[in-house]
């Protein structure tokens, strides 16, 4: 990123860093963020059933005018220096980005402690648990506005409530231990889905507005609307 100050990626609480450290951190932050948006775009293209096409935003940038089309409106981009983004194929990695991804994958796969931690989580963890007659669960139970369980499509089948937690937990484990390569890949992609999809119990908001918070000044674009579950959390009839 050369002389790019990467001001959209300024670190909070970075007073303890030298000017050169802050500059390097901001450039690294921007570089890996663009890689993230590209990688996510590739997953979305592989899985249109995830319903996340609206989160693919790189191809909605007008690179000549410096604006982003979002929700039928145009917004001025705060940063338009994207030397690694090809407007004709914005989600393709450059050779350097592909090399970074390969090295990161090798580092994760060969990190003994990380592998131990993941094995521990799979052995001891779960998305929900019944303990002392109490139901403990991560995040939220996706609900409709009327308080009923929301049906969610996972790889062509509908799930809701407990069944949704069960199938997501199942795919997380497949991502690590499935013998069939296709099922293992589906499990890995599902872990990303669980992290940021509006129908995921572990996220529970209509979008993860990372891109908008980086590149758009308008606060309206930063808003992340929570699932109705959070409005009904104290409603005894719903519970």
Enumerate the language-model features and the residues they cover.
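Feature recognizes metal-dependent phosphohydrolase scaffolds
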Residues: 1-239
């Amino acid at each position: 990123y050369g002389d790019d100050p990467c001001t959209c990626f300024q670190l909070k609480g970075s007073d303890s860093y030298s000017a050169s450290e802050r500059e390097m951190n901001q450039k690294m932050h921007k570089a890996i963020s663009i890689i993230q948006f590209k990688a996510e775009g590739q997953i979305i293209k592989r899985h249109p059933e995830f319903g996340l096409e609206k989160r693919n935003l790189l191809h909605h940038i007008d690179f000549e005018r410096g604006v982003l089309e979002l929700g039928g409106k145009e917004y001025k981009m705060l940063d338009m220096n994207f030397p690694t983004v090809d407007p004709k194929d914005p989600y393709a990695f450059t050779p350097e980005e592909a090399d970074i991804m390969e090295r990161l994958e090798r580092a994760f796969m060969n990190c003994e402690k990380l592998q131990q931690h993941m094995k521990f989580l799979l052995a001891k963890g779960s998305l929900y648990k019944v303990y002392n007659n109490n139901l403990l669960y991560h995040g939220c139970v996706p609900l409709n506005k009327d308080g009923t369980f929301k049906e969610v499509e996972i790889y062509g089948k509908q799930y809701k409530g407990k069944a949704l937690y069960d199938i997501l937990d199942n795919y997380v484990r497949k991502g690590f231990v499935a013998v069939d390569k296709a099922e293992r890949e589906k499990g890995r992609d599902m872990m990303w889905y669980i992290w940021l999809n509006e129908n995921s119990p572990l996220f529970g908001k209509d979008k993860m507005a990372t891109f908008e918070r980086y590149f758009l000044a308008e606060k309206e674009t930063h808003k992340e609307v929570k699932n109705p579950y959070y409005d009904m959390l104290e409603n005894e009839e719903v519970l």
